[in-house]
Amino acid sequence: MVSKLPQEFRRYLRNRNQLQHVLEETQQALELINLENFFPEENVVEELLSPLTLNRITHILANSPAIIILGQDSKAKAIVVNTLISNDILPVCNGLWRWIRLTYGQTNHISLTLDLEYELVENLQANEKPWSTLPIEDLTKSDNEDITYPTVLEVQLNLPILKDGVQIFIAPNNGAVKVLANEFLSILPIFLYALGEQPLTEQNLEELRDLKETYPFNPVLFISSLENISLNGIDPELTESEQHRLQNRLYTNDSTSSKTDDDSIDFDRMNSLGLSWLDQLTNLGFLGMKESVEVDQLSWLGSGQYISDFVGSCRKTDQILYFIRGCLQTYLINASTYLNEVHTASLRKFILSAFDMARIIQITPKRIQYAQHKENELYANLMKIVHEKQQEITGLIQNIIQEMKNDVLLSNNDVYLYQNTMSNNNQRTEWSATVKAAISEVQRVVLGRLCEKVAKQLVNSVNCLRESFIGTLQRCLLSLEKTYERDTCLLASDALKQILSAAYNVELHNSSPFSIYSFLERLNLIFMSSSLQWSSTHTLDVAWRRKVTIEILNSLSATKLSKIILMQFGDKLESSHDSFQAALRSIENYYSGKLERTEEQRIALRKYHAPRLAKLALESTSMIDVVRYGKPHCAEEIGRGQYGIVFACDGWGGKAGPCAIKSVVPSDESHWNDLAMEFYYNRSIPDHKRIVKLRGSIIDHSYGGGFGFGSAVLLISDRLSRDLYCGIRAGLSWLERIQIALDVLEGIRYLHSQGLVHRDVKLKNVLLDIENRAKLTDFGFCITEVMMLGSIVGTPVHMAPELLSGHYDSSVDVYAFGILFWYLCAGHVRLPYTFEQFHNKELLWTSVKKALMIVGIRPERLPSFDDECWRLMEQCWSGEPSKRPLLGAIVPVLESIQQKAKRSKSLQEVSSDKLQESSTDSRNPALALAEPYNQRGTVVSPPPTKRRTMKVVKYHLFLTNLYIQMREL
């Protein structure tokens, strides 16, 4: 068995090279995405492929595996090595040996190196004379040798067991773990520990503690250098109680010893030395064992990873080979798992970003239209105030003027009239200013107070508009400006906010009462045209100011003031409206280019980047499956389709039960991408009883003789008894067919809940178990709704009309279910008469296109159909997707049909029962499908449970990838 060691290393190197290629492709894909700036202000490479993850992967892929021989003493290590390579290359004796490395060479050669890099010039005894066993002098460590930077004795041997990269390191008795921890050797260690003729010493225990601390996740295989550590009788060195216990075990197990596997450890026949080793190793934590109460014997405790083990004899080389194989597989699985986590996280990020992009593309034009519509409504309502509120404002101004007169006449001082002038009421103060300047100052104070009162009343009149429009409008604009590039559109954005604040948010304060202060210039014209006959006294006391104030208020014309106010208000509204429209056009122009770029990025993610990462994810997860479980054995062929062949398999993946193997050979890059996305979506679907479970995948690179193209992809899934096509042809009862319809509906609903659309629901994609319960399979066209490119895919008869336009959503599965329900109700697999007359696929496809283009051409109604079933079919294959019922609304209809079918034994009896029950049934469940709340395109409030309408994303034709994929019936 140990002769197969080169084969294990060769397989490891081949798989490692494939993983290196996958890593390089992954780095290139992430760097390209980062370069094209799909995710601004994010370093995609560091986010998805973190330095820690990259170091873990490169540590495995850059270093070569090596067998590290540790042990109690040099003699034990020599025995294990000589047995392993089937050659007495090392002398069986003790001594202080240096590091020894055994590799393959065309001729036997020996040299001394420092850190495996620099060859030292030293006279070695092996170079002086022929040798078959290495001289002890060459193996012995010199006294002045530095433990930190050790010298390694390089030994090249022409032995087949050392081919294909096999290398064996024999570690010295002291300081080996520290050298390994420094990673000077650049290896992936596979630890074998040779046990000698005595229990572990304290020095051995300390070395093993360091090994456990330095490599906590690396298993160790402990090998006894003795040929046998079992006993045929009782060891006299044991105590009396131990001898009695072992004696009982010997007698108990004599009868079953012939049935015991030769490779397992017989703890009952282990001598005291073996039991001592097990006790010491258990205390160190290498071997986890517990004593069973029932059988009173030790048993192993295993974990998820490969664990340490014990071999009772160095002659059991098959167990050594099995351990080495497990360690090599663990390294490959770890590297593949790290890579697959990167791929899965990348795909998840891409799909979520595609959802975000689709939402931005849909909602941004709506937001701009909403902002424009709301601003137009606000502008129209405010202008309505300008044209219709003049009389109301005139009366308002008259009331305010009268109130101000009353306040002036009732006031005992001039605080209300003129706060800025410091004067004494008891003496007459001669002003240095002219009377004209004093009058102007009084005018300013009076008009300011008038403006304040009028403005407050005006704010109250438009306050309801501010509450109704401004808040929503500002929130909408804020959402638009979140992604607004401030460096290029700073002025437009700020101007838009200032316009809204100045024109519409009428916030009045005492210091700046509205913008009516700007009316002062025009109001002064009224006073200039008015000839006030005042006495030219220069004594400006309180009485004079009261008199001037009353005369100013009397001279004001409420009609003229209202006209001026409304004219000024209208001018500001018109100016603000024009500025708003200009700023909104600027935003619209900005988003026009941005949305086009977003659509291009979304298409690039869907068509190129996501499939590329999905292909790498397929390779990494296939590596895990092939390393862990190996290639499945393909038995007889059980099916054949357009893209591959399905074989039977007895079992695979560590699970019992038959499985089916779908073998696909991708013909080109597009086929690879489709297959990779199919696998990703199928693998990401959580387990469900109505979905066929995918067990794993294998990429057979030997099929085409090269990497990537020409390889065969094996998709392994659970195997069921037959498909629905064969089931209907063989004959199914009406109750069984109704139950199948419910099962298919449940599976489709579950896919839709996961954001997936099947796009190819048909008879052959529904599998039946031994109880005739249905499960959905074949997710070749399954895809998330946001990742759909408008491709024309599916089986012709089951294709919805909108598939030809390239604009469709999850309702295509409802249409396909309606066609499938036609077959279930018909009870046969013949094509509908509309399509049956065509003898080849080309004519059938032409007929289907005509049928889909012309509304109303659908499968015919058969005489066996009752009204309830036929109405359900018509609703499902409605020409308008919005008129098709929700899947949840179909369930009660099918359940009603099922309940009625249970009360009869044939479909004819069901029809007769319906005629009798029609008078008693208050409502037919099928009629409820016509209700708006059970359809996709209508939003109403009655039902407590309703589904949000799935909006259809419309694309420009030149941005779509319109291609046709057809499958055979």
From Swiss-Prot:
Pfam families: Pkinase. GO terms for molecular function: ATP binding; protein serine kinase activity; protein serine/threonine kinase activity; protein serine/threonine/tyrosine kinase activity; protein tyrosine kinase activity. PROSITE patterns: PROTEIN_KINASE_ATP, PROTEIN_KINASE_DOM, PROTEIN_KINASE_ST. It is an enzyme of class 2 (transferase). One of its GO terms (cellular component) is basolateral plasma membrane. Residues 904-945 are annotated as: Disordered. This is Dual serine/threonine and tyrosine protein kinase. It comes from Apis mellifera (Honeybee).
